[in-house]
A protein has these predicted regions:
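Beta-rich, blade/repeat-based domains predominating
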Residues: 28-36, 57, 84-96, 133-149, ...
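Asp-box/WD-like beta-propeller blade repeats and closely related beta-sheet repeat scaffolds
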Residues: 116-204
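Beta-strand-rich domains and repeat architectures in extracellular enzymes and scaffolds
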Residues: 26-67, 73-106
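A short beta-strand motif characteristic of beta-propeller blades
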Residues: 77-83, 124-134, 177-190, 250-255, ...
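Blade-loop segments of beta-propeller domains
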Residues: 74-146
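Short, conserved, GDST-rich strand-edge loop motifs in beta-rich repeat architectures
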Residues: 34-57, 154-165, 212-236, 373-391
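Beta-propeller domains
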Residues: 95, 190-342
Length: 437
């Protein structure tokens, strides 16, 4: 098939994407094209976990934890699926039908597809995709973003020099490569791109996609202590957010956001067409918003902790009403809550020390349950007694976090817990269980 036919077909597909009805998933950072919104109690958390040499089988694995308080195994690990190797497990994402989880390795660039739809409490590994480097030239698959019938993958690096210049790869839900999109290195709208990648966030109503930027394999697979002491290495972190036309998949603007902007979160309330991101190296929250002329702009609106101490903000999670934002800072182990009632002026209203190192944060759709995990990257995690590897669950009443349970992944011989995704039992199964009680 020639390029013109491919472009024509993709244009049609992305036209359908913009027109598609949307539903946000349980945890508030997922693709708007996800089905099966869990508005009530989630039953399971699946944790994509880095293998640790000498701990258990040493392999990366998908760990499943029962998180329903009415269950007899509440707060317990009820299963794990090992992939038989260690490739720096990091992030994962659902397909649009919510039946499959795609999970990637930042080191080996393999993608593992787990069936979580057939029996959510017992995931099965059904496919391994190993052709990303050969098909796209990219390595380090990070973000798995559901589109109708497709998965868009945001990558961190490339196979040529293992630096930060990279792009996006598009696959269909069956695991077949379709095409790729380079993140711009040239000038767009008067701002020069760095070509770096990280997260993906789509606003269908605005026909806009945002991508953020981190660093390449040569940095993230190196000791953090070495990286921060190497002036040359510190030059190789992203400093841009790219604005894309979703239908054409072409960049329309490049926004200057210094300090490695990581997770992107659109406000979810109807009509709230703004997004936020946190810059890891500068400890800043940035607001991305359209002006009256239709131009997108990035604005530094808040500081997280004391930037001089390099708290290293990592994951963020926006509330369903867009009025609150959780931020985890890795180095000091603090979970912060910001009031976003006025996104131009976020205010930190609460913080809690939740671990010796904390990374990912996920919340239920109703905002009443918050979960954190500890691991960032195998070469960046702390050592000795500070190398805490846990999942901690909390209740949130709008004023304070109260502990519900925790799982010690070191004690359980599982590894380093990173990304979390929620699932729930099928409604029919829940009804049968309720009648049996």
């Amino acid at each position: 098939m020639n390029n013109s036919k491919i472009s024509s077909r993709l244009g049609f597909v992305f036209g359908l994407i913009i027109a598609a009805s949307t539903a946000w998933a349980d945890e508030t950072c997922n693709s708007p094209y996800m089905s099966g919104l869990i508005k009530g109690q989630e039953d399971f958390i699946h944790v994509w976990t880095l293998g640790e040499k000498g701990l258990g089988d040493g392999s990366d694995k998908l760990v499943t934890i029962d998180v329903n308080p009415s269950s007899g195994t509440y707060g317990k690990v009820i299963g794990s699926v090992s992939v038989g190797g260690r490739g720096e497990a990091h992030h994962m994402g659902f397909t649009d039908d919510r039946k499959y989880l795609w999970a990637g390795g930042l080191d080996d660039s393999k993608i593992y597809v787990f069936d979580v739809g057939s029996s959510p409490g017992k995931p099965k590994l059904v496919r391994t995709i190993a052709d990303l480097p050969a098909k796209s030239g990219f390595v380090g698959p990070h973000t798995f973003y559901a589109l109708p019938g497709r998965v868009l993958i945001g990558n961190l690096s490339n196979g040529a020099d293992k630096g930060g210049v990279t792009g996006l790869a598009l696959y269909n839900n069956k695991g077949a490569f379709i095409t790729k999109y380079d993140i711009p290195t040239g000038t767009v709208g008067g701002v020069k791109g760095d070509g770096y990648g990280y997260d993906i966030a789509v606003n269908p109503s605005k026909n806009v996609m945002l991508t953020s930027s981190f660093t390449g394999w040569t940095n993230y697979m190196r000791s953090l202590n070495e990286v921060v002491k190497d002036p040359e290495a510190m030059k190789h972190f992203g400093s841009t957010v790219v604005v894309w036309d979703l239908k054409s998949m072409k960049p329309t603007q490049i926004l200057s956001v210094p300090g490695a902007p990581l997770e992107m979160r659109w406000a979810l309330a109807p009509g709230q067409n703004w997004a936020v991101t946190a810059a890891a190296l500068t400890s800043k929250i940035w607001l991305i918003k359209q002006d009256s002329a239709g131009t997108w702009a990035a604005k530094d609106v808040a500081t997280i902790g004391d930037p001089a101490k390099i708290p290293l903000p990592v994951d963020i999670s926006i509330t369903a009403d867009g009025k609150g934002l959780w931020v985890n800072t890795f180095m000091d182990g603090v979970t912060h809550y910001f009031d976003l009632s006025n996104p131009e002026h976020p205010r930190e209203t609460y913080q809690k020390h939740t671990g010796r190192q904390v990374n990912m944060v996920s919340q239920s759709w109703d905002g009443k349950r918050v979960y954190i995990t500890s691991s960032l990257l195998s070469k960046w995690d702390k050592s000795g007694a500070d190398n805490e590897q846990v999942l901690r669950a909390y209740r949130w009443d709008g004023h304070a976090l109260t502990s519900s349970f925790e799982v010690d992944f070191n004690k359980e011989q599982l590894g380093r817990p990173h990304h979390m995704k929620f699932t729930a039992k099928p409604a029919a199964q829940v009804a049968l269980l309720d009648r049996a009680k």
